[in-house]
Amino acid sequence: MGLRSCTHLATLFMTLWAVAFCFLVVVPIPAQTTSLQNAKDDRRLQELESKIGAESDQTNANLVGPSFSRFGDRRNQKAISFGRRVPLISRPMIPIELDLLMDNDDERTKAKRFDDYGHMRFGKRGGDDQFDDYGHMRFGR
C-alpha cells in the first residue's frame, strides 16, 4: 500500500507541475497583455508624431500638442516589457562599414592602364621607364 500511495503522489505531483507550467507559460497574464497593448499604442503614436512633425513646423506641433498630452502621460506609466525598445531610425540597406571592407580597384586599374594623356599602357615589365612622356612605348635603351 505504501508503494501505491507513493506512485499516486508522484503522478499527482507531475500533473500539478505540468498544469502549473502551462498556466505560467502558455496562458497570457493580463499585465503582459496590457503592456503589449501599451507598446503597440506607443509605436502607433510615435509613427503619428513623426508624420505630423515632418509635415508641420515645431510651432504647429505645439498647437496640436494638447490632443496628444494624454498619450504622453501613458508613456511614463508603461510597464516593463519583454525587451528594450529600439528607436525607429532610417538606415541604409548596406552598412557604412562595408564600404571600408570592400576594395574596389577600379581607380587603381584605370591609373595603371592609361597615362596622363589617355594612351593605353600595355605592360608594367619595365616600370615607368618603358613609356616616354607621351605614353608611347620605348624599345631598347
Curated annotation (Swiss-Prot):
Q: What does this protein do?
A: Drosulfakinin-0 (DSK 0) plays diverse biological roles including regulating gut muscle contraction in adults but not in larvae.
Pfam families recorded: Sulfakinin
> Where does this protein come from, organism-wise?
Drosophila simulans
Name its cellular compartments.
Answer: Secreted
Q: Which UniProt keywords apply?
A: Amidation, Cleavage on pair of basic residues, Hormone, Neuropeptide, Secreted, Signal, Sulfation
Chief place where the protein resides: secreted
Superkingdom in the source lineage: Eukaryota
Which molecular-function annotations from GO does this UniProt entry contain? neuropeptide hormone activity; neuropeptide receptor binding
One GO term under biological process is:
regulation of smooth muscle contraction
Q: Which PROSITE patterns match?
A: GASTRIN (PS00259)
Indicate what this protein is called per its UniProt record: Drosulfakinins
From the UniProt record, report the name of the gene that encodes this protein: Dsk
InterPro entries in UniProt: Gastrin/cholecystokinin_CS, Sulfakinin
PTM Sulfotyrosine: at which residues?
Y117, Y134
Q: Which family does it belong to?
A: Belongs to the gastrin/cholecystokinin family.
Q: Where is the signal peptide?
A: 1-31
| Propeptide segments, given as residue ranges | 32-73, 86-111
* GO CC, alphabetical: extracellular region
Question: Signal as a keyword?
Answer: yes
Question: Which positions bear Phenylalanine amide?
Answer: F82, F122, F139
